[in-house]
């Protein structure tokens, strides 16, 4: 059986105030990990007009100049003058950082071997993968991310000098659901809102973004005469960034993950060192899901992990393939159990998570980028019997579109 439906995902640029905060929090984390790979970091950032505040708990041997660090990130994003809405040179940087609670430290990592470290908190984490794109990510989100990335590439290289750092994109795709798989058919609607300088007309802005960004990013085969484009539908967007809206770390968790597909456990990523399973276990769940899909064992996979604070072994592991696998969910679960050690210490070791790699994750999504280790599929341990069953019952063809 098959049916058609619409699904929408959104993305925001690095100049969106919430994303600014994510990048600053992860820059703080990277600065500590660069000097002290065992640093324990939980750093939140808040921003509003002319102000950035860091707050949280950090236990580290590193010495970090937060004033220099915060201003460097804001300058990189592009807020370099008050006429744009924020100035990295003159903004106030407030610091309210304390040490990690000794009770949490005692329960999680003190006097424990690196591989025996307990989960930094309780919680549930999800991973998702789909064969609809090469990245095993939902096409709605991939296109939303790519629109923002292309827009700001053109801003940075001077091609579109009137574009400013704050923007949002949203893509709606018509899908066909077939045997549990999701097949993109066409782009139904595209929404782009970008901050801009006062000297560009809305007509020029809309024409340029449609021709030089949207139609450059989205394959022509997915666009038709019925596709709807809303470009700055509210009109002018001159006041942006923290002047337009307050920003807080961790408020774009759906943009960070799967664009509304799969599921989300509620925990944000940015500013957290890898002993926090909100981050490391979510990366591991994605690693599991994409490994199964890239191995051809399913067309779509959802993985749920849960943990208790101070306990290393997951409380539960769920593998759900939406009926798209020749194997049962129980058999896929067995492959996962045989192939992955999902304790925090092992996750950190196998994915090499004590490195300063996190600021980049806060810019354009944590998943779907091949440079991140959790995106590289793991060789799976599959019993001869299950391997034979998988080969003998191929996944039904769904003729997914090429991207």
Swiss-Prot record:
Pathway: Amino-acid biosynthesis; S-adenosyl-L-methionine biosynthesis; S-adenosyl-L-methionine from L-methionine: step 1/1. GO terms for molecular function: ATP binding; metal ion binding; methionine adenosyltransferase activity. Disruption phenotype: RNAi-mediated knockdown causes an approximately 65% decrease in S-adenosylmethionine (SAM) levels, with similar decreases in S-adenosylhomocysteine (SAH), the product of SAM-dependent methyltransferase reactions. Increased levels of lipids, including triacylglycerols. Increased nuclear localization of transcription factor sbp-1 and increased expression of known target genes of sbp-1, such as the fatty-acid desaturases fat-5, fat-6 and fat-7. Binds 2 magnesium ions per subunit. The magnesium ions interact primarily with the substrate. Binds 1 potassium ion per subunit. The potassium ion interacts primarily with the substrate. It is an enzyme of class 2 (transferase). InterPro entries: ADOMET_SYNTHASE_CS, S-AdoMet_synt_C, S-AdoMet_synt_central, S-AdoMet_synt_N, S-AdoMet_synthetase, S-AdoMet_synthetase_sfam. ATP binds at residues 16, 166-168, 234-237, 245, 251-252, 268, 272, 276. Its EC number is 2.5.1.6. Its cofactor is Mg(2+); K(+). Transmembrane segments: none annotated. K(+) binds at residue 44. Disulfide bonds: none annotated. L-methionine binds at residues 57, 100, 245, 276. PROSITE patterns: ADOMET_SYNTHASE_1, ADOMET_SYNTHASE_2. It comes from the Eukaryota. Keywords: ATP-binding, Magnesium, Metal-binding, Nucleotide-binding, One-carbon metabolism, Potassium, Transferase. GO terms for biological process: negative regulation of lipid storage; one-carbon metabolic process; S-adenosylmethionine biosynthetic process. Mg(2+) binds at residue 10. One of its GO terms (cellular component) is cytosol. The keyword Ligase does not apply. It catalyses: L-methionine + ATP + H2O = S-adenosyl-L-methionine + phosphate + diphosphate. Belongs to the AdoMet synthase family. Catalyzes the formation of S-adenosylmethionine (SAM) from methionine and ATP. The reaction comprises two steps that are both catalyzed by the same enzyme: formation of S-adenosylmethionine (AdoMet) and triphosphate, and subsequent hydrolysis of the triphosphate. May be required for the majority of global SAM production under normal growth conditions. This is Probable S-adenosylmethionine synthase 1.
């Amino acid at each position: 059986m098959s049916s058609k439906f619409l699904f929408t995902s959104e993305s925001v640029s690095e100049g969106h105030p919430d994303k600014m905060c994510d990048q600053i929090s992860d820059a703080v984390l990277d600065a500590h990990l660069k000097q002290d790979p065992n640093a324990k970091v939980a750093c939140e950032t808040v921003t509003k007009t002319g102000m950035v505040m860091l707050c949280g708990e950090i236990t580290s041997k590193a010495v970090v100049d937060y004033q220099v660090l915060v201003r460097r990130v804001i300058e990189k994003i592009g807020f370099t003058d008050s006429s744009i809405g924020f100035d990295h040179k003159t903004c106030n940087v407030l610091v309210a950082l304390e040490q990690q609670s000794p009770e949490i430290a005692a329960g999680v990592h003190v006097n424990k071997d690196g591989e025996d470290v307990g989960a930094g908190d309780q919680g549930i984490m999800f991973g998702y993968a789909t064969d609809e794109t090469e990245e095993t990510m939902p096409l709605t989100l991939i296109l939303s991310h790519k629109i923002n990335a292309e827009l700001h590439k053109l801003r940075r290289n001077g091609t579109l000098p009137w574009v400013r750092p704050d923007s949002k994109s949203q893509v709606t795709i018509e899908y066909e659901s077939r045997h549990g798989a999701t097949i993109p058919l066409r782009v139904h609607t595209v929404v782009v809102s970008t901050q801009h300088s006062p000297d560009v007309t809305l007509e020029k802005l809309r024409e340029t973004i449609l021709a030089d960004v949207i139609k450059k990013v989205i394959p022509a085969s997915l666009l038709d005469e019925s596709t709807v484009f809303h470009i700055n539908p509210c009109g002018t967007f001159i006041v942006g960034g923290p002047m337009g809206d307050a920003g807080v770390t961790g408020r774009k968790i759906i943009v960070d993950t799967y664009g509304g597909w799969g599921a989300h456990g509620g925990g944000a990523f940015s500013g957290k060192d890898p002993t926090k399973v909100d981050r490391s276990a979510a990366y591991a769940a994605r690693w599991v899901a994409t490994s199964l899909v890239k191995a051809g064992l399913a067309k779509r996979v959802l993985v749920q992990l849960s943990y208790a604070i101070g306990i290393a072994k997951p409380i539960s592991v769920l593998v759900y393939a939406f009926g798209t696998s020749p194997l049962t969910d129980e058999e896929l679960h067995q492959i996962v159990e045989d192939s992955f050690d999902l304790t925090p210490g092992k996750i950190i070791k196998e994915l090499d998570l004590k490195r300063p790699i996190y600021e980049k994750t806060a810019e354009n999504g944590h998943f779907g980028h091949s440079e991140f280790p959790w995106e590289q599929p793991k060789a799976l341990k599959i019993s001869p019997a299950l391997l034979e069953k998988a080969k003998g019952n191929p996944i039904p063809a769904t003729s997914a579109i090429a991207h």
